[in-house]
Structures are given as structure tokens and as C-alpha cells.
């Protein structure tokens, strides 16, 4: 876990963005007591357990540092898991920027390379003349 030593010139507020497919999350990180709210709801009360676990990964990895900030996240678009991954990316980027910690950044990159970079995959668009992106009529050569 990263040490709790913080640089003297920590920013007062950090705004970070995370994206996954069409889900976009904007996180506002400020000094506090460890409160995390997603669209106004506390993270502990989030209804979907898998999404809650995915969103709490950056906080668990940060350890004691996460208890020194309050995080407010607004997320929209996509499905519930896409939103969870977008929140996770926004929180991880924001914590690294807030504490300006190279150690925390390396910890996140070792745990999951996509926690800071994001996932570049997007949905392939539908082509004209066929029902879906790649589906075609079956051919029979008899």
C-alpha cells in the first residue's frame, strides 16, 4: 500500500473523467473523511453487488489515502457494469491526480493496466444491407 505522506502542495479539488463504451463518469475529489457518493447515493448502498465491488477497487488499493478525501461521482449512459467501470476509472485517475503519487499510479497499473488508461473497445456500427454489424445471409453452394 502507498505511504500516507502527501506532498505539501496537494490540489484542493480534482475533477477527473472515466469512460467505458457509452458510459461517462465525472468524479470530483476534495479533502474530507472518506465519503463516496455515486449519483448522490453512498457507495455502500449501491444496489448491484458486482458493480459495487468493481467501483470500490481503487479505494481498497489506495488504503488509508482514500479515507482522506470525499469523492462525488456523476455517471450517465451505458449499462450498469459499463457505468461501474467508468466510475472506477474516474476515481483511480482522480486519486492519482489528487495525491500526485507515482507509487499509487504504479500500484494501479500493476493491478489492472486499464484502471487508468480505459478500455478503447467500442461497439461496431451496423452496415447497410445486413441486420447487424457482421451478420450476413448464409450461403449454400450445392
UniProtKB/Swiss-Prot annotation:
Q: Residue spans with biased composition (Basic residues)?
A: 123-142
Its protein name is Small ribosomal subunit protein uS9
The protein's matches in NCBIfam families, at most eight in alphabetical order, are given as: PRK00474.1 (NF001749), uS9_arch (TIGR03627)
Q: Which PANTHER family match?
A: RIBOSOMAL PROTEIN S16, RIBOSOMAL PROTEIN S9
Q: Does the keyword Iron-sulfur apply?
A: no
Q: Name one GO cellular component term.
A: cytosolic small ribosomal subunit
Question: Which InterPro entries would you find in this protein's record?
Answer: Ribosomal_Su5_D2-typ_SF, Ribosomal_uS9, Ribosomal_uS9_archaeal, Ribosomal_uS9_CS, Ribsml_uS5_D2-typ_fold_subgr
Gene name of the encoded protein = rps9
Keyword terms: Ribonucleoprotein, Ribosomal protein
The disulfide bridges present are none
Which Pfam families does the record cross-reference, listed alphabetically? Ribosomal_S9
Q: Which family does it belong to?
A: Belongs to the universal ribosomal protein uS9 family.
Region annotated Disordered sits at 117-142
Which Gene3D superfamilies would you find in this protein's record? 3.30.230.10
Q: Does the keyword Ribosomal protein apply?
A: yes
Q: Which domain of life is it from?
A: Archaea
GO biological process terms, alphabetically, are:
maturation of SSU-rRNA from tricistronic rRNA transcript (SSU-rRNA, 5.8S rRNA, LSU-rRNA); translation
MF terms per GO, please?
RNA binding; structural constituent of ribosome
Q: What HAMAP family does the database record attribute to this sequence?
A: Ribosomal_uS9_A
Amino acid at each position: 500500500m502507498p505511504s500516507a505522506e502527501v506532498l505539501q502542495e496537494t490540489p484542493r479539488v480534482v475533477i477527473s473523467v472515466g469512460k467505458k463504451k457509452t458510459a461517462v463518469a465525472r468524479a470530483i475529489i476534495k479533502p474530507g473523511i472518506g465519503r463516496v457518493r455515486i449519483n448522490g447515493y453512498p457507495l455502500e448502498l449501491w444496489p448491484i453487488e458486482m458493480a459495487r465491488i468493481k467501483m470500490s477497487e481503487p479505494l481498497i488499493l489506495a488504503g488509508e489515502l482514500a479515507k482522506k478525501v470525499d469523492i462525488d461521482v456523476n455517471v450517465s449512459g451505458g449499462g450498469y457494469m459499463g457505468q461501474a467501470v467508468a466510475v472506477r476509472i474516474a476515481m483511480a485517475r482522480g486519486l492519482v491526480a489528487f495525491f500526485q503519487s507515482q507509487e499509487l499510479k504504479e500500484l494501479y497499473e500493476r493491478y489492472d493496466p486499464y484502471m487508468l488508461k480505459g478500455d478503447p473497445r467500442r461497439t461496431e456500427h451496423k452496415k447497410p444491407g445486413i441486420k447487424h454489424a457482421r451478420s450476413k445471409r448464409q450461403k449454400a453452394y450445392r
